[in-house]
Amino acid sequence: MSFTSSSNNERERWNQKYLEAAGAETWTVPDPFLARAFSGYILPLFPHPGSALDLAGGAGRHAIWLAKQGWEVTLIDVSDAGVEQARQNAGPLASHMHFVVDDLTHFKASQTEFETAFEVVMAFFYLEREIFPEMVQAVRPGGLLVYKTYTLAQAKLAGGPKNPAHLLAPGELLQLADGLRVLHYCEEVTEKATAELVARKEK
């Protein structure tokens, strides 16, 4: 792994967040969308557990949940503190998981610490538009991309990011997923303003 000065700053910023709020519900309780995506799309397509990639997985709340369903999960995050918490939170499941500290702003599916594509690639509340094609490349033919993050409407709500660079415009996620077959898409504003997607990479 290698870090630029900017990614070092990002790593330190997230390290501080994880260390200050270790064990907080924010880092340990999975977003309900994962369970819905699993029962509605992942399980029907893959009744036998496969391999999954969790990008910007932090302390492992989504990776660990999927590992509990029998899946082999690789988690990548820029924060070594977050990844170490994920390893600890996983407990015995850690033996069936892979933990990678790396700068995702330069993520290349062909250069990571794995050799095959994944049945499921997921990312929650992480937006790096430039690597979206690499995320899609990491999905094996017939596999799924499961994605959820904030939209521009979040700027007017409490919490979450306010920088437009970290917020999706209306319909933007569908554009980013162009070329995939969309199975589920929803934009909504409740306590958070989010867009969520399940899309399949055709064979």
What are these regions (language model features)?
Residues 143-150:
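Conserved beta-strand signature within the Rossmann-like core of class I S-adenosyl-L-methionine
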Residues 127-136:
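A short, conserved alpha-helix within the catalytic core of class I
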Residues 1-58:
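Conserved class I S-adenosyl-L-methionine
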Residues 93-106:
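Conserved SAM-binding strand-loop segment of SAM-dependent methyltransferases
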Residues 79-81:
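Conserved SAM/SAH-binding beta-strand->alpha-helix loop
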Residues 86-87:
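Conserved SAM-binding loop
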Residues 109-120:
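A short acidic, Gly/Pro-enriched loop at the edge of an enzyme's catalytic core
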